[in-house]
Amino acid sequence: MTTAAASSPRTYQVRTYGCQMNVHDSERIAGLLEQAGYLRAGAADDTPDVVVFNTCAVRENADNRLYGNLGQLRPRKDQHPEMQIAVGGCLAQKDRSEIVRRAPWVDVVFGTHNIGSLPVLLERARHNAAAEVEILESLEVFPSTLPTRRESTYAGWVSISVGCNNTCTFCIVPALRGKEKDRRPGEILSEVRSLVDEGVLEVTLLGQNVNSYGIEFGDRYAFGKLLRACGDIDGLERVRFTSPHPKDFTDDVIAAMAETPNVCPSLHMPLQSGSDDMLRAMRRSYRSERYLGIIEKVRAAMPDAAITTDIIVGFPGETEADFERTLDVVRAARFSSAFTFQYSKRPGTPAATMADQLPKAVVQERYERLIDCVEEITWAENRRLLGKTVEVLVAVGEGRKDERTGRLSGRARDGRLVHFDAGSLAGQVRPGDIVQTVVTYAAPHHLNADGEPLAHRRTRAGDAAEAGQRPRTAGVSLGLPTVGAPPPMPPAASSACSC
């Protein structure tokens, strides 16, 4: 029998669904697999040795999407029996053995608390020729200790906490991610510095509720202190965070945002509903007046701040008057963008069994009215930037039409998406570089800048992108098994082409 060590390295692919937390978890999954000797499958490889689904249980029809994708893989699995399929993330934490019952060709099911076990579970499933299902009820190892394969040379996610202590009636995340666990500030800042040392310019601090950071070690001002400490890190040009909860938003955090030059003038703060009755039913612990009061304070401290939000339409019991109150708050808040969702039942949440579930047609009609209202406001807010100079961090994959239009794309400091013409700098601007340019056109969801750029600054992140390099966070040694023997690293190329 040929041993794994003697065979060629096995390849992997990670498919991610859901929020930024899942995106960052997938970076950890990739880092774990590469540390264990796997190689990332090429884009054209439709039969990798391992396919990992990192799932979401929050989005509508998340289970149907997963089982549909698993069904599409079954013929390939039948043709290539050595192929392994693993399912992790929130849906795996929720459904557990149900996944293997409905899709018996799945090899491994792992949860949100034991990502670090994946390489061992894959090896065990291969050895035993049987599915491995391992779901833990509490965090095994804080995810920051796991190796990470970063997808960007210029921007990185850094978790400051996992889990959530809130009990929103529509949300299943606390049941799947557990109670809030906070990293200590020194660990967070060490990770941020290591990313900056590798050329990263922008860091997003991640947590289910970043404003409650510090509750585990008894410091209610910890998040403001953390933002200010990030301001002392040389080379860190942009700091963002997501998501805060309005009930925990303090004046100290607003002051820290305004006082710290590298904290971006942007804020994503979920509203969910503008109706106090709906907020009470959602168990959101704030009311619309407090929400608008926070926005007023943020804009007083940071007049150019772009504020974005999440809104749910059609929550059980929502009346036309409740919905009109949501529109009123949207008009008063003047969001620069909004993620809007039609309510759908999440099994296991209190809202799923509430009376007065709304007909689909009513929810759809309100949803369309909300979209129209939001787009009217975001378009007006974007038009205010016509003729203004913006600083753009050039990104990869932000502009779906870039190849056809000849533009490049990136994010302004306030988080707005900017498509720009490189002009005489065409071929010189790389992902991770900084460009200053003037806004010439505004749409509801983006800005265009079609004049000659005013300035271009080459960065170490751009150098790394050009060389095909990515920053990595090594984490700590977990004694993981090595599967196969990775080939030597190729020489760096000399040139090359988001509660």
UniProtKB/Swiss-Prot annotation:
Top-rank taxon: Bacteria
Region annotation Disordered: where it falls in the sequence: 449-476
Broad enzyme group: transferase
Cofactor note text: Binds 2 [4Fe-4S] clusters. One cluster is coordinated with 3 cysteines and an exchangeable S-adenosyl-L-methionine.
Transmembrane segments: none
Biased composition (Basic and acidic residues): 449-463
EC code: 2.8.4.3
Binding annotation for [4Fe-4S] cluster 1: 19, 56, 90
Cellular component, GO annotation: cytosol
InterPro entries given in the database record: Elp3/MiaA/NifB-like_rSAM, Methylthiotransferase, Methylthiotransferase_CS, Methylthiotransferase_N, Methylthiotransferase_N_sf, MiaB_methiolase, rSAM, rSAM_horseshoe
MTTase N-terminal domain boundaries: 10-127
Protein's cellular compartments: Cytoplasm
Binding site for [4Fe-4S] cluster 2: 164, 168, 171
PANTHER family: CDK5 REGULATORY SUBUNIT-ASSOCIATED PROTEIN 1, MITOCHONDRIAL TRNA METHYLTHIOTRANSFERASE CDK5RAP1
Family membership: Belongs to the methylthiotransferase family. MiaB subfamily.
General function of this protein: Catalyzes the methylthiolation of N6-(dimethylallyl)adenosine (i(6)A), leading to the formation of 2-methylthio-N6-(dimethylallyl)adenosine (ms(2)i(6)A) at position 37 in tRNAs that read codons beginning with uridine.
Protein name stated in the entry: tRNA-2-methylthio-N(6)-dimethylallyladenosine synthase
